[in-house]
Amino acid sequence: DEEPKESCSDEMCVIYCKGEEYSTGVCDGPQKCKCSD
């Protein structure tokens, strides 16, 4: 398993947080990210 990245590009993954779409955050899987906040 690869270690989580510090950031993700929108091409790598899209996350949803607080009802808004984000394209940055900690990678958590091939198509998921965690919110940076």
From Swiss-Prot:
Name this polypeptide is given: Potassium channel toxin alpha-KTx 11.1
GO cellular component assignments: extracellular region
UniProt organism field: Parabuthus villosus (Black hairy thick-tailed scorpion)
Pfam families attached to this UniProt entry: Toxin_31
Tissue expression: Expressed by the venom gland.
Top-level taxon of the source organism: Eukaryota
UniProt similarity note: Belongs to the short scorpion toxin superfamily. Potassium channel inhibitor family. Alpha-KTx 11 subfamily.
Function description: Binds and inhibits voltage-sensitive potassium channels. Inhibits the vertebrate potassium channels Kv1.1/KCNA1, Kv1.2/KCNA2 and Kv1.3/KCNA3 with low affinity. Also weakly inhibits Kv7.1/KCNQ1 (10 uM of the toxin inhibits currents by 21.43%).
Consequence the record notes for mutating V26K: Increased affinity towards Kv1.1, Kv1.2 and Kv1.3 channels
Protein location: Secreted
Gene Ontology terms, MF aspect: potassium channel inhibitor activity; toxin activity
Disulfide bond entries: C8-C27, C13-C33, C17-C35
Domain notes: Has the structural arrangement of an alpha-helix connected to antiparallel beta-sheets by disulfide bonds (CS-alpha/beta).
One of the GO biological process terms: envenomation resulting in negative regulation of voltage-gated potassium channel activity in another organism
Record's keyword terms, sorted: Disulfide bond, Ion channel impairing toxin, Neurotoxin, Potassium channel impairing toxin, Secreted, Toxin, Voltage-gated potassium channel impairing toxin
